[in-house]
Amino acid sequence: MSNIIKYKKKILNGDLLTKEEVEELLEEDITDLAATANEIRESLCGNKFDLCTIINGKSGRCQENCKYCAQSAHFDTDIIEYNILNSDRIINSAISNYNKGVHRFSVVTSGRALNNNEVDTLCKTYSKLKETCSIRLCASHGLLKYEDLKRLKDSGVTRYHNNLETSRKFFTKICTTHKYDDKIETIKNAKKAGIEICSGGIIGLGETMEDRIDMAFTLRELSVESVPVNILNPIKGTPLENQEILSYEEIIKTLALFRFILPTVQIRLAGGRTIISDKGKKALESGVNGAISGDMLTTLGIETSEDIKMIKNLGFEV
């Protein structure tokens, strides 16, 4: 019996794989690995597909030095900078996306964390939005404290996004202005506030497959509900502007392994799809059951109507 079949049976019996068992899958055929990851997804998660979209609610001037990010003030990337968007702009965007068939809508803001006035402003917007539209509200506002996260929860936010980005071991190679434990503390505080967690990372930063596996196991320990996987789209002006883009095979392998490690979570194909050949079609057949649609924060994405057509053609329910 191959390791793929053996470990699929173990997972479907309700058991979780160890890190050593996952490492045994590294040499398996990628096509078989992806197909089996998709079978695990279908058996444990069904065919429901979770589609979300984001809006850049505050852009640029970030004091953090994440090497991949166009919004860092440490780098010269020529992005447009602005403060918190007005309420009407955010609400209209949410309604528009809801009418297109999107399930979740997230306001994402630059910076280490919002200040009290910014939290107040967005909480008022979330409260209005909750009364106006049935779209599920997500938020990504940096390393907030418990009290602010509770305010978001009370305003209608159901899920908080805070990426680990990579493994603990590799993290210091991409950011030195905050710590891995700062992220973990934020995630734990959001859970304490009663908010679901969306946390994943970026692949293609120069990390190893071992780093990706380590991150996935940390996410499993944190019991997150959604794991977005971004593919690095190198931005001119950042330290990673010349980083080699991952092969599609490596992307598919990573996604499939994540399904073996995280059998019941939403694995969400996120930024970077425009740089791969089929806009993510093969990736969506590798254990994935969610995606971010539309434009990303500082890069272009894929039209929601195009995404929904592709997702339905693959047999998912949107």
Swiss-Prot record:
What are the binding positions for [2Fe-2S] cluster in this chain? 106, 138, 198, 268
Is Cytoplasm one of the keywords UniProt gives this record?
no
Residues annotated as domain Radical SAM core: 44-273
For activity, the cofactor(s) needed are: [4Fe-4S] cluster; [2Fe-2S] cluster
Q: Could you say which residues bind [4Fe-4S] cluster here?
A: 62, 66, 69
What GO terms describe the biological role, i.e. biological process, of this protein? biotin biosynthetic process
Matching entries from InterPro entries are given as: Aldolase_TIM (IPR013785), BATS_dom (IPR010722), Biotin_synth/BioAB (IPR002684), Biotin_synthase (IPR024177), Elp3/MiaA/NifB-like_rSAM (IPR006638), rSAM (IPR007197)
Its keywords, alphabetically, are: 2Fe-2S, 4Fe-4S, Biotin biosynthesis, Iron, Iron-sulfur, Metal-binding, S-adenosyl-L-methionine, Transferase
Catalyzed chemical reaction(s): (4R,5S)-dethiobiotin + (sulfur carrier)-SH + 2 reduced [2Fe-2S]-[ferredoxin] + 2 S-adenosyl-L-methionine = (sulfur carrier)-H + biotin + 2 5'-deoxyadenosine + 2 L-methionine + 2 oxidized [2Fe-2S]-[ferredoxin]
GO terms (molecular function) for this protein are: 2 iron, 2 sulfur cluster binding; 4 iron, 4 sulfur cluster binding; biotin synthase activity; iron ion binding
Q: In which pathway does it act?
A: Cofactor biosynthesis; biotin biosynthesis; biotin from 7,8-diaminononanoate: step 2/2
Q: What is its EC number?
A: 2.8.1.6
What binding details are noted for the cofactor?
Binds 1 [4Fe-4S] cluster. The cluster is coordinated with 3 cysteines and an exchangeable S-adenosyl-L-methionine.
The entry's function note states:
Catalyzes the conversion of dethiobiotin (DTB) to biotin by the insertion of a sulfur atom into dethiobiotin via a radical-based mechanism.
The protein's matches in PANTHER family, at most eight in alphabetical order, are given as: BIOTIN SYNTHASE, BIOTIN SYNTHASE, MITOCHONDRIAL
Entry's family note: Belongs to the radical SAM superfamily. Biotin synthase family.
Oligomeric state and interaction partners are given as: Homodimer.
Its protein name is: Biotin synthase
Q: What is this organism's lineage?
A: Bacteria, Bacillati, Bacillota, Clostridia, Eubacteriales
